[in-house]
Swiss-Prot record:
Positions with a binding annotation for (6S)-5,6,7,8-tetrahydrofolate: 111-114
SUPFAM superfamilies hit by this protein: FMT C-terminal domain-like, Formyltransferase
Organism: Thermosynechococcus vestitus (strain NIES-2133 / IAM M-273 / BP-1)
Pfam families: Formyl_trans_C, Formyl_trans_N
Name of the molecule in the record: Methionyl-tRNA formyltransferase
Listed transmembrane segments: none
NCBIfam families: fmt
Name of the coding gene: fmt
Function: Attaches a formyl group to the free amino group of methionyl-tRNA(fMet). The formyl group appears to play a dual role in the initiator identity of N-formylmethionyl-tRNA by promoting its recognition by IF2 and preventing the misappropriation of this tRNA by the elongation apparatus.
Length: 331
């Protein structure tokens, strides 16, 4: 089976790698987003998928605007691919491209559709505290993640998962599911989505990263792991990224690391939100939220390396009753 692969970020690597490892499938080329300026040097850098394709000698196309490229549809048509596989490509495929391959365009989506349609399903599943998500393969249509579904596979979300770890799990699961889908493709019966059950996962905005200590400990924990590594608060006028937290509340006590379970308390308004309540040796500061205490176990001051919450306590001589600024979020 001949395949053209559309993909851009790290999430799209495992399925592409799995295709190349399987003799049944021939990857004819890769379509990915144009190089972007990244890092402190602001240098042009290829997408993870492009870098992978270069290492493996695959033809690469990088149209800035897929809908405005008059030549690419003809190039793709000339390849006579059986199927296009699309994984977090980053642009909507026009009907003129969807109609090209014999078996259509198969998308790997990082949720159990029709839940979390859109650009950021992994992040919003974490944000909403889901304990289960998964991967869906579907036949693409002109809508946003609205095509008929082929196969699904569930993945458990753990309390310590963040956007990076969950993305890696779903990418590997998606790679397995893609091979199963392609193997069964001629016989698979696509299942229409129930639009009444659809939920949405829109693009993330920078304003979503701000920590509002008036929210509950569990809600803030979910925000930190959903938007890892960008959630932040303010400490003495400086941005402080919050990279890892543990809500010290009864409803998740059994899921906490064992050394922390003895610190679990019933939520009470012991101090104004954002106030440091305690310092747990070897772990970090415990902060009052709108409902329950939240342990900050990994943080990063602006311009510095990430560090444990305890190293932060010692480095800045953080004291009990210190107040973190409340930065009202847009959420």
């Amino acid at each position: 089976m001949n395949i053209v692969y559309f993909g851009t970020p790290e999430f799209a690597l495992a399925p592409l790698q799995r295709l190349l490892q399987t003799e049944t499938y021939q990857v004819l080329g890769v379509v990915t987003q144009p190089d972007r300026r990244r890092g402190r040097g602001n240098q042009l850098s290829p997408s993870p998928v492009k870098a992978f394709a270069l290492r493996h000698g695959l033809p690469i196309w990088q149209p800035p605007r897929l809908r405005q490229d008059p030549q690419l549809p003809e190039v793709l048509r000339s390849l006579a691919a059986d199927v296009f596989v699309v994984v977090a490509y980053g642009q909507i495929l026009p009907q003129s491209i969807l109609d090209i391959p014999r078996y259509g365009c198969i998308n790997i989506h990082g949720s159990l559709l029709p839940r979390y349609r859109g650009a950021a399903p992994i992040q919003w599943a974490l944000y909403h505290g889901e304990e289960e998500t998964g991967v869906t393969t579907m036949l693409m249509d002109a809508g946003l993640d609205t095509g008929p579904m082929l196969l699904k596979r569930k993945v458990r979300i753990h309390l310590e998962d963040n956007a990076t770890t969950l993305s890696a799990k779903l990418s590997e699961t998606g790679a397995d599911l893609l091979l199963d889908t392609l193997q069964q493709l001629p016989q698979l019966q696509a299942e229409p989505q129930n639009d009444a059950e659809a939920t949405y996962a829109p693009l993330i905005q920078k304003s979503d990263y701000a920590i509002d200590w008036g929210r509950s400990a569990l809600a803030l924990h979910n925000q930190v792991r959903a938007f890892y590594p960008y959630a932040y608060t303010q400490w003495q006028g400086t941005a402080l990224k919050i990279l890892q937290t543990w809500p010290l509340i009864p409803e998740v006590a059994a899921k906490l690391p064992e050394p922390l379970q003895s610190y679990v308390r019933e939520p009470e308004a012991a101090a104004p939100p954002g106030t440091v309540l305690a310092l747990i040796k070897g772990w970090g500061p415990v902060v009052q939220t709108g409902k329950g205490p939240l342990l900050l176990s990994q943080v990063q001051l602006s311009g510095r390396k990430a560090q444990s919450g305890w190293d932060f306590v010692n480095g800045v001589r953080l004291a009990i009753a210190t107040q973190f600024a409340i930065v009202p979020s847009a959420l």
